[in-house]
A protein has these predicted regions:
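N-terminal, active-site-proximal structural segment of metallo-dependent hydrolase catalytic domains
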Residues: 1-126, 136-143, 281
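Eukaryotic serine/proline-rich intrinsically disordered regulatory segments
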Residues: 2-10, 17, 24, 43, ...
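Structured beta-strand-rich core segments of catalytic domains in phosphoester-bond hydrolases
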Residues: 36-59, 63, 108-215, 219
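Generic structural signal for small/hydrophobic residues in well-ordered secondary structure
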Residues: 69-70, 97, 101, 147, ...
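Active-site metal-binding loops of divalent metal-dependent hydrolases
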Residues: 71, 114, 213, 254-256
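Feature marks short, surface-exposed loop/turn motifs that line or immediately flank catalytic pockets
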Residues: 73-75, 214-217, 260
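Glycine-rich phosphate-binding loop signature in dinucleotide/nucleotide-binding domains
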Residues: 103-105, 199-203, 237-247
């Protein structure tokens, strides 16, 4: 009997604590003005650094603004590490994701680790953009996106791509030959996405490429190999194609998973001859 009364008493105390907690939260909510709750931005406001602000531009040149970042795929969220963190849920992240993609007065966007595409796409199109999205591999859960502005703007807007290519970086060696199975022994499932976007008004356009290179910090050789494949692909557009768009400016933006002191960066910026010995020492350690 005593044990039964103890359990009842504990249950009543728990219920009372829960009621008081609910009352407190309702009082706080009621005392907060609606405008304060509704005006909270989806993303933090940040100041951007202006670069090349005073560079002379040809009179008939077009200016475009491109943003690029890794979206951090929802499919890669480790909820078991943060079981109480509701900020990792898609319904919480989604407004911020869309705001970051569309609210920086950008004309173009290159994004990596994009998934939940059915949830993101309607908001992107409503904001005046269209996009192409590719995973490259059926078993891969996230992919690359190139986004362009379609709504009238004081700068550039774009029509749908006149050309698109997806390159599976595992399937091509650095000299351009197709390989039987993954190149060397790494299976990375990394890809390159390229589109040729014509301007909505007037002649010309822009070729936009994005990629997400191999992530592991120990394997610099694989990143350098993938970068070589990418540069060969982009260079071949100039040499092989007879299309008008092949002469358009090319922009490569993406997540290279690397740093400015790396061999990959040195190779991409044309400094290989100056640092040949250092590059060889760095890359041979991770070559398979």
């Amino acid at each position: 009997m005593t044990s039964h009364m103890d359990h009842d008493d504990i249950a009543r105390k728990r219920a009372e604590r829960a009621r008081r907690k609910l009352d407190q939260s309702q009082n706080v909510s009621a005392s907060t003005p609606d405008t304060a709750r509704c005006e909270k931005p989806a993303v933090a406001d940040r100041e951007w650094m202006h670069i090349n602000h005073d560079v002379a531009v040809e009179q008939d040149a077009r200016r475009v603004r491109l943003v690029s970042w890794n979206m951090l795929a929802q499919s890669l969220v480790r909820r078991e590490l943060f079981p109480g963190s509701d900020c990792l849920k898609l319904k919480t992240r989604l407004p911020g994701i869309v705001a970051e993609m569309t609210s920086h007065d950008n004309d173009l966007g290159c994004f990596q680790e994009v998934d939940s595409i059915n949830e993101i796409a309607p908001s992107i199109r409503q904001a005046g953009f269209d996009f192409v999205y590719e995973r490259g591999y059926e078993e891969k859960k996230h992919g690359l996106m190139i986004m362009w502005k379609t709504k009238a703007s004081t700068r550039a807007t774009f029509e749908s791509p006149v050309w698109k290519k997806v390159v599976r970086l595992d399937d091509v060696d650095k000299w351009g030959d197709t390989v039987d199975g993954p190149s060397l022994s790494r299976c990375t499932r990394n890809i390159l996405l390229i589109v040729a976007l014509p301007f909505s008004s007037g002649p010309g356009g822009i070729i936009v490429a994005t990629t997400h290179l191999f992530w592991h910090p120990r394997y610099g050789y694989e990143r350098a190999r993938q970068a070589a494949v990418i540069m060969r692909e982009l260079s071949s557009l100039r040499a092989a194609s007879q299309e008008d768009w092949s002469s358009w400016p090319i922009v490569l933006a993406g997540d290279l998973n690397d740093q400015p002191h790396s061999s990959t960066y040195t190779l991409l910026t044309g400094q290989a001859a100056q640092y040949r010995d250092q590059i060889r020492t760095d890359l041979m350690a991770s070559r398979v």
